[in-house]
């Protein structure tokens, strides 16, 4: 999976960066939100918990997707601004199996 940033804009009022990116997934399936969040966080030197993938659309007949992401300065600000269902989609916790 490769990520190409199409546009990036700073939003000082909401204390976030708004990014449109192209996700090139080659022969494999469409990548998960989690993998896109982790990769974008690594590229932009941010924590994965501060990155929100708002939407991700696969293009028909092409092996790429267009994603809209936001990187917040703090988790508190993210929870104030984003809708609860979007935050829930982007919070990835490790589930422990009961043994």
Swiss-Prot record:
UniProt keyword Ribosomal protein present: yes
GO function terms (MF aspect): structural constituent of ribosome
InterPro entries, sorted: Nucleotide-bd_a/b_plait_sf, Ribosomal_eS24, Ribosomal_uL23/eL15/eS24_sf
Signal peptide positions on this chain: none
Pfam families from the UniProt entry: Ribosomal_S24e
Gene Ontology annotations of biological process type: translation
UniProt xrefs under Gene3D superfamilies: 3.30.70.330
Disulfide bond annotation, renumbered to this chain: none
Keyword terms: Ribonucleoprotein, Ribosomal protein
Gene Ontology cellular component terms for the protein in this record: ribonucleoprotein complex; ribosome
HAMAP family for the chain: Ribosomal_eS24
Family: Belongs to the eukaryotic ribosomal protein eS24 family.
Name of this chain's protein: Small ribosomal subunit protein eS24
Species in which this protein is naturally found: Methanothrix thermoacetophila (strain DSM 6194 / JCM 14653 / NBRC 101360 / PT) (Methanosaeta thermophila)
């Amino acid at each position: 999976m490769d990520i190409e940033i199409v546009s990036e804009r700073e939003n000082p009022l909401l204390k976030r960066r708004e990014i449109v990116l192209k996700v090139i997934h080659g022969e494999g399936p469409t990548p998960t939100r989690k993998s896109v969040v982790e990769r974008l966080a690594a590229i932009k030197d941010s924590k994965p918990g501060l990155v929100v993938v708002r939407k991700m659309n696969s293009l028909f007949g092409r092996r790429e997707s267009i994603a809209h992401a936001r990187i917040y300065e703090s988790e508190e600000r993210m929870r104030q601004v984003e809708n609860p269902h979007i935050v829930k989609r982007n919070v990835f916790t490790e589930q422990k199996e009961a043994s």
